[in-house]
Amino acid sequence: MTVEAFRSIINPDDPMFANPSSMVEAIQQYCRRTSQPVPETPAEICRCIFDSLALRYRQVFEWLQDFGKSQNSNLKSQINTLHIIGGGSLNKYLNQFTANATGVVVKAGPQEGTALGNIMMQAQAAGLVSDIWQMRQIIANSIDLVTYTPQDKELWDAAYEKYLKITQ
């Protein structure tokens, strides 16, 4: 089943999504309130959520880049890779949508970032590693990351403009 992309868009950080009794009903209410098509099927609801999360990631990503430039006027390079760790790194659709929306390469993994960090801290306490750079190198050499490259730039740029209008 194919579901239309960007048919319905929400701001995932809207307070109405903090702890609703029904997330589906909250999404539908938001779409009604913003005069959008109301997602009805599970596929439409999932697509709304994934599209909206990726577009929100782009917005926050742009804010962070702007903040970095404002703090360091000599900062000339843009962030060109976004790392997603933890359980979210397993969601291939959201990771691809995130790459598409942000326009940067997404590297997904490791899934168990917290556990690996804990292991590395224990290794440091035992004198087996000397610093964070060595820890990062060990993890990088031990874990296969999945790389997602941006696609469909024009489509996602248009969707982002729609997102900004809806979420103002």
Where are these regions (language model features)?
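Glycine- and other small-residue-rich loops at beta-strand/loop junctions that grip anionic moieties
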Residues: 87
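Active-site core segments that coordinate phosphate-bearing ligands/cofactors
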Residues: 1-69, 79-81, 90-114, 120-151, ...
